[in-house]
Amino acid sequence: MGVTAITVVTLMDGSGRIPAFVGEAHPDLWKVLTEWCYASLVQQRRAADEDTPRQHVVLRSSEIAPGSLALLPRATRPVVRTRSDPTAPFYITTETHELTRRPPADGSKPGEPLRISPPPRLDTEWSSVINGIQYLNSGARGTAPIHLWILGAADLCDQVLLAASRSTAAGAPGAPTGARLTRRRPGLTDADALDVIVAGIPATRAMFARVHNRSWRHAGEWTEALHAQIVTRGDVRRRRGGRGNGRERAPRCTIS
């Protein structure tokens, strides 16, 4: 049957815009989306009807660490090799696959390593999103319907959104988060219609602002703002003062 549903999991600002590259947003934001994607996948798999099983495949950018997705079988968590914009505030070095904050242009402060991500060679690699969908539609993975999750920035998601007849709806100003966009015969599946569900975290424009030509001080302020955004979406944060073990649970991340 091939791909019958696609869920695009990405970041989104208040105007419905998504980052062009993974490096335009702090890696902690991608970490939250990765964990949410895995939790949603597991929840749907448990609630699925045993008579009509559905396969789940999670495709992500090679610049995003797998996180809990590493618990899935290797064949169901492929990657597409993407390359960060050289002007993005965060970038990955090709040799070590180390994600680093880009240093200021004047060289007053060196780049700051943020985390190490497993090299893409540890995962099944697709040449592109479209080729991967064609592979799934070929029946190589059986006849069960497939739910494809796409996790990444515009350089990965646009290949699907632009292939649909109403692609402008996803990036239009004021586009609602979690909107269900029905696509009529986009050429990605033999089905008459394909549901593309766009899920994102509402964010401020500062999250995706380019800081390569700004001062390091502004970059630091945006980084702190991103961490504050993360801590309100489900991370365990340390409480200052008071009794107890000093840890409290922040509100859970909700994406509708």
From Swiss-Prot:
Residues 167-180 have a biased composition (Low complexity). Belongs to the herpesviridae US2 family. Residues 245-256 have a biased composition (Basic and acidic residues). The gene is 28K. Residues 100-120, 167-186, 236-256 are annotated as: Disordered. It comes from Suid herpesvirus 1 (strain NIA-3) (SuHV-1). Transmembrane segments: none annotated. InterPro entries: Herpes_US2_varicellovirus (IPR003485). This is Protein US2 homolog.
